[in-house]
């Protein structure tokens, strides 16, 4: 006698599976572009079944935003007070690497949380920063321990912002060592003989199209692309919303133009910085100083390009992804020449770690632009890279 079909058994950890899948989708696509249908499909259930666990997309998003923060707090609670900095950084690194696919949610997308949820998340990360800060101060009695702590966390968090294939244990070891070097770096000991970085200026808007772009960039940076309306952009340049379409087919084309401008300015700055460098070590120093200068000088433009790139349609995103890869390839090549013991994947992970330092240290300094701040952050980037 043949047994009839067996009904599928619902896994007991269905809610956890949903949160994990949602974290990946939110991290890859952004909050507004993510759909409950896509999340449900990734879990292998219907959207209707998904709504039995979460009443709406925001509720699911808010839980995703909490997952890694809760994991970090729990991991650090298991590290005894007064433990070596290595133990603290290792605990943070293990949780972050384990949540690599979904960890990008907190860096850019957390701005879409409501005020109460954002304050709660900020308090959790504040606890993490406090534990790292305490250990950094205890182990390396140097200036700017808070800056060094957030920069070290920037190294670790960088793994959530790219897709370089690397074994989990190798990633943990590489990031922990890099973060430890950052914590031990004296930002005040930055090279005083380094020549100032001169970047190409952002183009002066001389046409209505350029004026629209210049007005849209700070709005996108402040509120997020999805939250900014055509009406807001039009009002900023004294136009009726319908008049925007004479210059751009749609709002997404304004975003694409902003991202292209960011890529062009960075590429020009890199070309200038590498002119007449003496060798690979000096080349990496020049690259670091240039990227830091670019990030401080073009903060709004850079944040838009970093946060919103994934939301562009594939046809508009393609050339930008190529430019991004070419930029990283320059860093990787020069870093491997300066540190021949690194393989390509290790070098690439460290390059992204350097970018993570700039993001978190810049935020910690509230992007106050000065020669001192630029020099300090550049020193921390070089520490992350092992130079």
PLM features: what roles do these ranges have?
Residues 115-140, 146-147, 173-174, 315-340, ...:
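Amphipathic alpha-helical packing segments from all-alpha helical-bundle domains
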Residues 2, 126-141, 165-226, 367-387:
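C-terminal peripheral helix-coil segments that are non-catalytic and often amphipathic
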Residues 93-119, 153, 295-315, 355-359, ...:
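Amphipathic alpha-helical segments used for helix-helix packing
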Residues 76-102, 272-299:
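Hydrophobic alpha-helical connector segments
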Residues 54, 61-68, 255-262, 305:
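Alpha-helical DNA-contacting segments of helix-turn-helix folds
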Residues 18-26, 212, 216-220, 262, ...:
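Short hydrophobic clusters on alpha-helical segments that form packing/core surfaces
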Residues 68, 89-115, 136-191:
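Hydrophobic, ordered structural segments
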Residues 17, 21, 25-59, 223-253, ...:
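Helix-turn-helix
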